[in-house]
């Protein structure tokens, strides 16, 4: 679990997301409260439940990006799902319980990687010795015992040095490794993924594990042997137990596009992919027990963060019970020209930095001037206002059009520096932004 304080979390999010201070503060406090809760005694800890969050704001303002970055910051099981992928229990499609199953799978993977990294040095030593056993020749029979030992020690040291330096990477050797029986591919009908996964595991385990001899390059042999030896040092039952505990105590679920499952006023009949999904989400958010292939998982203390644009609906269109279980509501603001300008230059790995790096691979150097950046931001904002506001995503469309000629002729401009100033932007974008037919900019 991350031990970062709210200001530290906000500072990290600031590196990638411009503005939206309220949303950043809300998620940073929620993340810190996960750590605070774990410091309490067991009785009080059980009573403290997470305060779930609903993020409201137009498309392209950073809701999904906050989730992506939060996943990296939170050293906890995390999963992002689209609300539109689910249908009500009893109908064809994914059931909401699969959210918890997927979260548990993510936790298993996370804990497994942690355990592998913990044993990394030991595994590397074992693999190195196995490779050396194959590489080092047996001493001649007519040698004395001391000659054998001395020669063997020198040879091992020589090969060990070459192995560590990567000199022998391309050399082929024959090794014995575990081979698993080929699994049977099963086409899963919607909503039956859990059953098909169990059937595939069953078929894979029927043949057991056998050793087989394979001739491989040393670099490939190291990869396979590392996986094999790492698996031997891992206790699967302990990993399952630890993963389920991590999910129950620190799990975070981000539900995107929740506005798309609001019931429409003019609809009639059973609403299996809208209100039905909301009803199925209720027990998960409130707290229930879900059966997974790794064991039973309680959802009482899992943090749920939902987000939606709510362009054709409002949060009050959600069923009242679900509204009550998302007590913290944060509104994200539409982006301005100044925000666009910052998005183009300030974040780590900004869009302009990405284009510059891509062109440098062909020996073309791009220089964006301050005036040029401002003009790009104004062009994107103008198109958003004229057609449909899709937020920061519009910058990708505008920049792609702006860089089209440079990208196409990059090989002919090797060694040149191209300055993208206000004149260049006006020449390539003004005609398009002033044109009434802006359909080409709609994503």
Swiss-Prot record:
GO BP terms: protein unfolding; proteolysis involved in protein catabolic process
UniProt GO molecular function: ATP binding; ATP hydrolysis activity; peptidase activity; proteasome-activating activity
Keyword Chaperone appears in the UniProt entry: yes
GO-annotated cellular components: HslUV protease complex
Keywords from the named record: ATP-binding, Chaperone, Cytoplasm, Nucleotide-binding
Predominant subcellular localization, coarse grouping: cytoplasm
Cysteine-cysteine disulfides: none
CDD domains in UniProt: RecA-like_HslU
Domain of life from the UniProt record: Bacteria
Binding sites annotated in the UniProt record for ATP: 18, 60-65, 256, 321, 393
Entry keyword annotation includes Metal-binding: no
Localization in the cell: Cytoplasm
Similarity section: Belongs to the ClpX chaperone family. HslU subfamily.
Purpose of the protein: ATPase subunit of a proteasome-like degradation complex; this subunit has chaperone activity. The binding of ATP and its subsequent hydrolysis by HslU are essential for unfolding of protein substrates subsequently hydrolyzed by HslV. HslU recognizes the N-terminal part of its protein substrates and unfolds these before they are guided to HslV for hydrolysis.
Database matches in NCBIfam families: hslU, PRK05201.1
Record's subunit section: A double ring-shaped homohexamer of HslV is capped on each side by a ring-shaped HslU homohexamer. The assembly of the HslU/HslV complex is dependent on binding of ATP.
Name of the protein in question: ATP-dependent protease ATPase subunit HslU
Organism name: Buchnera aphidicola subsp. Acyrthosiphon pisum (strain 5A)
